[in-house]
Amino acid sequence: MIYPLLLSALPLLSSAALTYRGADISSLLIEEDAGISYKNLNGETQALEDILVNNGVNSIRQRVWVDPSDGSYDLDYNLKLAKRVQAAGMSIYLDLHLSDTWADPSDQTTPTGWSTTDIDTLTWQLYNYTLEVCNTFAENDIDVEIVSIGNEISSGLLWPLGKTSNYDNIAKLLHSGAWGVKDSDLTTTPKIMIHLDNGWDWDEQEYFYKTVLATGSLLSTDFDLMGVSYYPFYSSEATLSSLKTSLTNMQSNYDKPVVVVETNWPVSCPDPEYSFPSDLTSIPFSAAGQEEFLEKLAEVVEGVTDGLGIYYWEPAWIDNAGLGSSCADNLMVDVNTDEVLESVTVFEDL
């Protein structure tokens, strides 16, 4: 009787794996245009998407800008990237910045030609935009797993109308953007996400969701997932313990699955601007450290009811190895050889 019991337990063990073991490789086409060719762990040149899927990555996040001056990250750019991602067998997560450039807590600039004075006009423009994006993917027979309405929007979106001085406007915008996705021609409706920064900060998460839902203009049924960024090098308070508390509270209060949609760990950080969180200081700045960090992070996410996944932000952006942080290198690729690091294999175990 012992052996059947052991065998019956095996599926339960495998079911604990993360649903999304992801990476954001938005810069891939730009890097390739600059002459970069990636190499796998055997030193052989191989398409980055194939390297990733062969090492356990099953979902790719892509940032989408509305009308960038040079075409970077626009809809056509993302269609080209998504076709490759889908052909490699991975799901696609579209991160709509709703801007012509970077959108984050410090800047949420409304796209050129969109209203900055009338909220009804802006909500209609947003609806039509999310509808157009999804319909264009449908026309190209590309499935979309997740769509995020905005990027790191704890300070609002589509400024000035969508600033946090008016949460009713924020709610209207999120509702409208979500329904553009829902009304699209995609065969399977993507999961709709709201994405905030500082995932470890429960007070920040609670205030945003409590306030925006209290307006009545955004319904709980308008979105499916709650996404967070979690960067350990921006605050000593960003402990794994705080992240677990925050994610647990988010899921229990709002009954939505949670995903860590941006994270990094450095292989080199000689002069960090901030002290690292106390429960992470034993992890080395190395490829082995990246593996250890992601394994610990996965334990936190898996330990939360409906904790679905992790996306590593830009592991192969060789021309931007610090990835905007004070650390010198957060990549999973050797900047001198273009060969992936051993840490890329960690996704198989998450």
From Swiss-Prot:
What positions does the record give for glycosylation?
A: 128
The record's catalysed reaction(s) read: The enzyme specifically hydrolyzes (1->4)-beta-D-galactosidic linkages in type I arabinogalactans
Major localisation: secreted
Q: Name one GO molecular function term.
A: arabinogalactan endo-1,4-beta-galactosidase activity
Gene Ontology CC: extracellular region
* Localization per Swiss-Prot or TrEMBL: Secreted
Signal peptide (UniProt feature, chain positions)? 1-16
InterPro entries cross-referenced by the UniProt entry:
Glyco_hydro_53 (IPR011683), Glycoside_hydrolase_SF (IPR017853)
Show the Pfam families listed in the entry: Glyco_hydro_53 (PF07745)
What is the E.C. number? 3.2.1.89
**Function recorded in the entry:** Endogalactanase involved in the degradation of plant cell wall polysaccharides, and more particularly of hairy regions of pectin.
> What's the protein name?
Probable arabinogalactan endo-beta-1,4-galactanase A
